[in-house]
């Protein structure tokens, strides 16, 4: 019995990659220094994986920004606008990820989307010229040879041709048609080069196969691989899937020329049933994904061994594997000195998951009952308390009317118009303002008890004053307090709710250099005291203008945390919803007229198969949001915000959330959402996001005016809000002020024309 992992976190044990790249972005280090830091990290990771006794060690899973972009660059799928900048390869790569504004030109970044049902974001490759598609990159070969120098025969990992092709945004059908042929030839050339290097195994990741596949999808997949696998020669090919099962194509895969199939037995609801029904091919190896790559709880070896024993009825050729890449979990629990050992023993981050794979291999390769098995089973005895009877009773007492807001949206809109007295095209921001080093160090000093609560509060109040003043000088209509007290929109609420646990170093990559530290939902959730009330009241006291109350919604808190596995996601979300509802009512009672409840991650846990959307997710996720705000008065305006996702196919459900205003992250996708909003007669007022905050470039007044005009061509002027597409926390003040001034100027210019 051997073991394997799909891929490993690339940010480093202490986010070394993030800091090295950011240093380069700030011109504080050279290209050579950045590339050396990256290589050092790769070497460290390989040695760690090797030391842990993993047989199939991945290479090419490392990335300076995003592995989808890496695959696109490998095959020269680069839009002409980036080529025309005439930058060197590394800076062209970063121009695609972040945009570019400088002496060589001014271009926006590639669109960013959620990676399937995770909180990782990938960059959408753009192809306007298929003629140039060819194997021009060498990253995959270089990194294989780097590992080889360490004495490691690695398994290069690459996104498969079918998934990559499906993720590319093509200029038109003609470009797409030519790209299909060119990309196939490029992958064939890749196979040839890997054969020349005498590579043993290549892992091709095809997560797109876990979606509902059409006949056309299956035909395209077969067309690609029937040709491609004829060129594999001595190269062994592992087809790796994750985030679901392969029910639409599994029987065909058994007859294919793949040497191994990687199946997900954590999220793949039908993976085992498919094997029980169709068996497994004698000429193939099964890479069994039984270590959860997306959650941080320790593996129960009894359950894993039971699964392996069942699989062994159908094949003896089994490799123990992770269910998906380990980049979705933190690096290691060894940096957690503050968490009580009674909790910590039940957690397994990436490094500990390597140990679990090693243990399981050893247990399966030994004949008698192994002490490793007994030690694992002991972990699950005497678990700390998770239940709260008061929370259970409150959930039980919920009635149907608790999930419905009255009066109707139409009636509320008239009442709010009279009450709020906002101009046409009201301007606002999404919530957070830049968090400079002094804001972060003030928060850290307070956490480490180096300063008093009074000092901490006074510092933040001064920052709020400055933030309100900046917004008033710029001329925004609805203000925010800036969220200087918050490290992260989810972690902050988790820290102030009962039922959550927190790590010191549990960082996970969200996109590029952005890392998040998800809380752990351990027990039943409740609010013991107001969370944001004092900050909101203070901010509102500073201005005659409306200052929004800012909260994170229950679905986002759930989706951006590591969830419990002992109760349903529905129950966990409803518990959080009741806690946030208490906060909403406190804000309203304090005179806060607009309350924003962000559901940035609503789409994130949407099942990948459409048939499961309602029964497994939307039927409880939307009501959970309704539960949060159903108790407010008609004159209180409820806002929500969503980002990084495609929403066009669930807009009716979003409308059913019954918020009064919703802001979307739509600027990176060229406002394509607007046509759907218009088509379905979306009732909620909308702020589509007029510029991309993930890029350091400052949009001009002309550019913003054109964007606003584009929105006005699609939606009634009474329905539109003008705002950036996301929070401003990660940007510098000079970019923010310049961008917002241009936003207000453009809006005023358009108002005059109306």
From Swiss-Prot:
The residues that cross the membrane are none
According to its UniProt record, the EC number is 2.1.1.14
The cross-references to InterPro entries, in alphabetical order and at most eight, read: Cbl-indep_Met_Synth_N, Cobalamin-indep_Met_synthase, Met_Synth_C/arc, UROD/MetE-like_sf
Q: Which reaction does it catalyse?
A: 5-methyltetrahydropteroyltri-L-glutamate + L-homocysteine = tetrahydropteroyltri-L-glutamate + L-methionine
User: What residues bind L-homocysteine, as annotated?
Assistant: 430-432, 483, 598
Job of this protein: Catalyzes the transfer of a methyl group from 5-methyltetrahydrofolate to homocysteine resulting in methionine formation.
- The name under which this protein is listed is 5-methyltetrahydropteroyltriglutamate--homocysteine methyltransferase
Q: Which species is listed as the source?
A: Campylobacter jejuni subsp. jejuni serotype O:6 (strain 81116 / NCTC 11828)
Primary gene name: metE
């Amino acid at each position: 019995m051997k073991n394997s992992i799909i891929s490993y976190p690339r940010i480093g044990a202490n986010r070394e990659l993030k800091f090295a790249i950011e240093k380069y972005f700030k011109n504080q280090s050279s290209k050579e220094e950045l590339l050396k830091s990256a290589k050092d990290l790769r070497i460290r990771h390989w040695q760690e994986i090797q030391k842990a006794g993993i047989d199939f060690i991945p290479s090419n899973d490392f990335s300076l920004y995003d592995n989808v972009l890496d695959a696109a660059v490998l095959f020269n799928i680069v839009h002409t606008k980036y080529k025309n900048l005439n930058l060197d390869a590394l800076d062209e790569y970063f121009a695609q990820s972040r945009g570019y504004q400088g002496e060589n030109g001014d271009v926006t970044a590639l669109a960013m989307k959620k990676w399937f049902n995770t909180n990782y974001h990938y960059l959408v490759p753009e192809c306007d010229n298929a003629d140039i598609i060819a194997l021009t990159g060498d990253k995959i070969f270089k990194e294989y040879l780097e590992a080889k120098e360490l004495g490691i025969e690695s398994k290069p990992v690459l996104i498969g041709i079918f998934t990559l092709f499906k993720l590319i945004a093509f200029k038109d059908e003609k470009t797409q048609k030519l790209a299909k042929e060119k990309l196939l030839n490029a992958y064939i050339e890749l196979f040839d080069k890997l054969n020349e290097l005498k590579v043993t195994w290549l892992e091709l990741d095809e997560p797109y196969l876990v979606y509902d596949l059409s006949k056309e999808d299956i035909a395209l997949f077969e067309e690609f691989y029937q040709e491609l696998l004829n060129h594999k020669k001595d190269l062994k090919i592992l087809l790796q899937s994750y985030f679901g099962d392969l029910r639409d194509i599994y029987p065909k895969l058994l007859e294919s020329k793949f040497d191994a199939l990687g199946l997900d037995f954590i999220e793949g609801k039908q993976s085992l049933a498919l094997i029980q029904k169709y068996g497994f091919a004698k000429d193939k190896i099964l890479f069994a994904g039984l270590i959860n790559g997306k959650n941080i709880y320790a593996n129960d070896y009894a359950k894993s061994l039971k699964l392996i024993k069942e699989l062994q009825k159908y094949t003896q050729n089994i490799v123990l594997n992770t269910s998906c890449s380990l980049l979705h979990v933190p690096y290691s629990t060894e940096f957690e000195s503050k968490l009580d050992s009674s909790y910590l023993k039940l957690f397994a981050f990436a490094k500990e998951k390597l140990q679990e794979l090693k243990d399981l291999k050893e247990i399966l390769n030994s004949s008698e009952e192994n002490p490793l098995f007994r030690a694992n089973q002991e972990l699950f005895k005497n678990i700390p308390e998770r239940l709260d009877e008061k929370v259970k009773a409150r959930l039980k007492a919920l009635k149907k009317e608790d999930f419905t807001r009255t009066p109707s949206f139409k009636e509320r809109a008239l009442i709010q118009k009279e009450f709020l007295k906002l101009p046409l095209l009201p301007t606002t921001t999404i919530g957070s303002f830049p968090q400079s080093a002094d804001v972060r160090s003030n928060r850290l000093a307070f956490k480490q008890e180096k300063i008093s609560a009074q000092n901490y509060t006074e510092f933040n109040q001064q920052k709020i004053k400055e933030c309100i003043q900046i917004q008033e000088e710029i001329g925004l209509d609805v203000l925010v307090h800036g969220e200087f007290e918050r490290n992260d929109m989810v972690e902050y609420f988790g820290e102030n709710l009962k039922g959550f646990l927190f790590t010191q170093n549990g960082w996970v990559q969200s996109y590029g250099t952005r890392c998040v530290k998800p809380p752990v939902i351990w027990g039943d959730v409740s609010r013991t005291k107001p969370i944001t009330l004092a900050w909101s009241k203070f901010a509102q006291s500073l201005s005659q203008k409306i200052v929004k109350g800012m909260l994170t919604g229950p679905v986002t808190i759930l989706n951006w945390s590591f969830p419990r596995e002992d109760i349903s996601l529905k129950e966990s979300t409803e518990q959080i919803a009741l806690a946030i509802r208490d906060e909403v009512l406190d804000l309203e009672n304090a005179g806060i007229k607009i309350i924003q409840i962000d559901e940035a991650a609503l789409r994130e846990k949407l099942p990948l198969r459409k048939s499961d959307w309602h029964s497994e997710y939307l039927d409880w996720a939307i009501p959970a949001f309704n539960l949060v705000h159903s108790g407010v008065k008609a004159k209180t305006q409820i806002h929500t915000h969503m980002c990084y996702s495609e929403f066009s196919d669930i807009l009716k459900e979003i409308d059913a959330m019954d918020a009064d205003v919703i802001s979307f992250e739509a600027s990176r996708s060229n406002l394509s959402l607007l046509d759907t909003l218009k088509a379905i007669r979306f009732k909620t007022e909308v702020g589509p996001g007029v510029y991309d905050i993930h890029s350091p470039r400052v949009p001009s007044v002309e550019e913003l005016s054109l964007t606003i005009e584009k929105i006005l061509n699609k939606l009634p002027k009474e329905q539109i809000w003008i705002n950036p597409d996301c929070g401003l926390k990660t940007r510098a003040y000079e970019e923010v002020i310049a961008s917002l001034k241009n936003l207000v100027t453009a809006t005023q210019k358009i108002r005059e024309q109306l």
